[in-house]
Amino acid sequence: MKQYLQLLEDILQNGVYKDDRTGTGTLSVFGRQLRFDLREGFPLLTTKKLHIRSIIHELLWFLSGDTNIRYLKENGVTIWDEWADEKGDLGPVYGAQWRSWRGADGRTIDQISEVIEQIKTNPNSRRLLVSAWNVAELDHMKLPPCHYAFQFYVENGTLSCMWQQRSVDTFLGLPFNIASYALLTYMVAQQCDLQPKELIFTGGDVHLYMNHIEQAKLQLTREPRPLPKLIIKRKPASIFEYRFEDFEIVDYDPHPHIKADVSV
């Protein structure tokens, strides 16, 4: 995961100060890419400990199509609390767009089901893409999608994934995003009888919040450790039937957690 640390260094050295929506301020760079070979291990950051439970439950929540944080709260996940309304609703965010995109003709589109079917039946398609950036519904979302689209690529029995992100909280958010899209790639690969190969991140406004600068510098003093492995214990009938206990991360030996505040 040295490429992640190199990105932190890049922002610290080349970032420009920008005011932002939260009032915190950022150091920002524009247009960056990271690549992870999934055959070398599961890309879970080792220079600080990540909350694996939150990563897995959030992805299962996205895939369920749910947009209320009740499920997350029941499973000890608090990462969406700051944006939900008093009933726990977030509006038509990721889960709604992935599973029930509302078209102009009134029909709903399950993008996840469709992309998996296309991978199975038309793997050379250049349309293996899911988008959460539904312009007509952005104003109804408590937080418009930061990671707004992802695309799959099939070659020689392997599956790669590239996701696009308009806004990147590099210290807190990006490590979660990397692990989440890696997990999604493993799951889709298993459902399609493929092997996971590569994960690619493409970011637009890639930034460090000003109240994360010292934490980033601390992280840069730490040496990356060997990547853990992901074990998926069973293959359910569909991607929507995975359970939390189906996943096991082994040989994860991270440096201690580094506390940092979320900018809302």
From Swiss-Prot:
Pathway the protein acts in: Pyrimidine metabolism; dTTP biosynthesis
GO biological process: dTMP biosynthetic process; dTTP biosynthetic process; methylation
Catalysis: reaction(s): dUMP + (6R)-5,10-methylene-5,6,7,8-tetrahydrofolate = 7,8-dihydrofolate + dTMP
Keywords recorded for this protein, A-Z: Cytoplasm, Methyltransferase, Nucleotide biosynthesis, Transferase
InterPro entries for this protein: Thymidate_synth/dCMP_Mease, Thymidate_synth/dCMP_Mease_dom, Thymidate_synth/dCMP_Mease_sf, Thymidylate_synthase, Thymidylate_synthase_AS
CDD domains: TS_Pyrimidine_HMase
GO molecular function, one term: thymidylate synthase activity
Record flagged with keyword Transferase: yes
Keyword Transferase: yes
Binding residues for (6R)-5,10-methylene-5,6,7,8-tetrahydrofolate: 51, 169, 263
Record localization: Cytoplasm
Signal peptide: none
Sequence positions that bind dUMP: 21, 126-127, 166-169, 177, 207-209
Taxonomic superkingdom: Bacteria
Entry EC number(s): 2.1.1.45
Catalytic residues (UniProt): 146
GO cellular component, one term: cytosol
Family: Belongs to the thymidylate synthase family. Bacterial-type ThyA subfamily.
Quaternary assembly: Homodimer.
Job description of the protein: Catalyzes the reductive methylation of 2'-deoxyuridine-5'-monophosphate (dUMP) to 2'-deoxythymidine-5'-monophosphate (dTMP) while utilizing 5,10-methylenetetrahydrofolate (mTHF) as the methyl donor and reductant in the reaction, yielding dihydrofolate (DHF) as a by-product. This enzymatic reaction provides an intracellular de novo source of dTMP, an essential precursor for DNA biosynthesis.
Name of the featured protein: Thymidylate synthase
